[in-house]
């Protein structure tokens, strides 16, 4: 059956040629069903048991879990099947045609992160999965680039409990054991419109928001003072005011003002605690103006994540690569996979190429990535 598996570069080419864009805008959003079915066929050919899982609340999106081996524990290799949209005017190549030039493989998803599945398949093409002493799981998720709905749903509903997991996001083969979370929040203030010549006849939402922002700034300073993690370049939780919209004319009392902000919590900080701190900070405004201030999530929140530095997975990967683990500020699906088992983020390609025009993966990553996958599978599934 394995004779049917295409060569590495042809697997890569087929993955890139199969669009699977995730977007909040419905017109741009695409199902990943074709890509999932393609992966399902290849992993079946390698002897894996394949399960395709519809993801509720999405526009026809699916997860795939391929399983081989018996017993408990083992290794999970995970990644997402979707990409971000692309700006056609800024690409100099067809995003859906894998193009090799000057030591680089170009295409949408080459680095972030369809290519990781080509590496897994290629590393396993000569493996008899019936000889595994522990389970090997391959997880392909949906909607990482928007809501992370695939990883959320999988982690909440699966019964598998591997010994450890590796998520193949582009880290330039630098193992990552921790990252901050992300909370994207809106604060909306409702006033009462009126003619600006008589301010007493209205309630100016901008003035109420001014009060609210002042209290949010106090919270920002408090977070910086109270929470610290020396491993991060920015060692405290950040709070950013991203956009502010309110009013429609200079001679009208503003009836509505809305602030969009984000908080990037450190590992170990709970989302409930942070939401509580924000509500507490804005309580004086709410009490003075009942019913006029609301707080809501713009996107599903992502907690911070950290793999224990003394875990066997960290020690094994550091020894194999000769590289110490690091931490980053961007987010991945690791917080959700970490609820199942200790997790590292580690994969080929550079994060600097993710979400960029003419995205590429350097061919220098091909050999070491194939070797790394072979080694970790051997260590965690045959020992």
Curated annotation (Swiss-Prot):
Keyword Disulfide bond carried by entry: no
GO terms of biological process kind: L-arginine biosynthetic process
Cofactor binding note from Swiss-Prot or TrEMBL: Binds 2 Zn(2+) or Co(2+) ions per subunit.
GO cellular component, as recorded: cytoplasm
Main localization of the protein described in the UniProt heading: cytoplasm
Highest taxon listed in the record's lineage: Bacteria
Short name of one Pfam family: Peptidase_M20
PANTHER family with a match to the protein in the record: ACETYLORNITHINE DEACETYLASE
Annotated protein name in UniProt: Acetylornithine deacetylase
Gene from which this protein is expressed: argE
């Amino acid at each position: 059956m394995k004779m049917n598996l295409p060569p590495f570069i042809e697997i890569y080419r087929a993955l890139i040629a199969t669009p699977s864009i995730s977007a909040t805008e419905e017109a741009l959003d695409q199902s990943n069903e074709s890509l999932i079915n393609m992966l399902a066929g290849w992993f079946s050919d390698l002897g894996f048991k394949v399960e395709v899982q519809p993801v509720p609340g999405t526009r026809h999106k699916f997860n795939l879990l391929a399983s081989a081996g018996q017993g408990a524990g083992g290794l999970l290799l995970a990644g997402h099947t979707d990409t971000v949209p692309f700006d056609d005017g800024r690409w100099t190549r067809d995003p859906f045609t894998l193009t090799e030039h000057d030591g680089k493989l170009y295409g949408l998803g080459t680095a972030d992160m369809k290519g990781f599945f080509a590496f897994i398949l290629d590393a396993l093409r000569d493996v008899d999965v019936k000889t595994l002493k522990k389970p090997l799981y391959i997880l392909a998720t949906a909607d990482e680039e928007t809501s992370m709905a695939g990883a959320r749903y999988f982690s909440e509903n699966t019964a598998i409990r591997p010994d450890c997991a590796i998520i193949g996001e582009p880290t330039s083969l630098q193992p990552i054991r921790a990252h901050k979370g992300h909370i994207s929040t809106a604060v909306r203030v409702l006033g009462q419109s009126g003619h600006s010549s008589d301010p007493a006849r209205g309630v100016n939402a901008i003035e109420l928001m001014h009060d609210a922002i002042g209290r949010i700034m106090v919270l920002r300073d408090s977070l910086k003072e109270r929470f610290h993690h020396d491993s991060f370049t920015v060692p405290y939780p950040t709070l950013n005011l991203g956009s502010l919209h309110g009013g429609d004319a200079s001679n009208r009392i503003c009836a509505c003002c809305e602030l969009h902000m984000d908080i990037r919590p450190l590992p170990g900080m709970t989302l409930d605690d942070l939401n509580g701190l924000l509500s507490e900070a804005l309580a004086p405004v709410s009490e003075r103006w009942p019913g006029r201030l609301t707080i809501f999530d713009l996107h599903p929140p992502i907690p911070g994540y950290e793999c224990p530095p003394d875990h066997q997975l960290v020690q094994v990967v550091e020894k194999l690569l000769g590289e110490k683990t690091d931490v980053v500020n961007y987010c991945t699906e690791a917080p959700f996979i970490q609820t199942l088992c200790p997790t590292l983020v580690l994969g080929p390609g550079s994060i600097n190429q993710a979400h960029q025009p003419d995205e590429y993966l350097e061919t220098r990553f091909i050999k070491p990535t194939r070797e790394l996958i072979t080694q970790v599978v051997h260590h965690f599934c045959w020992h």
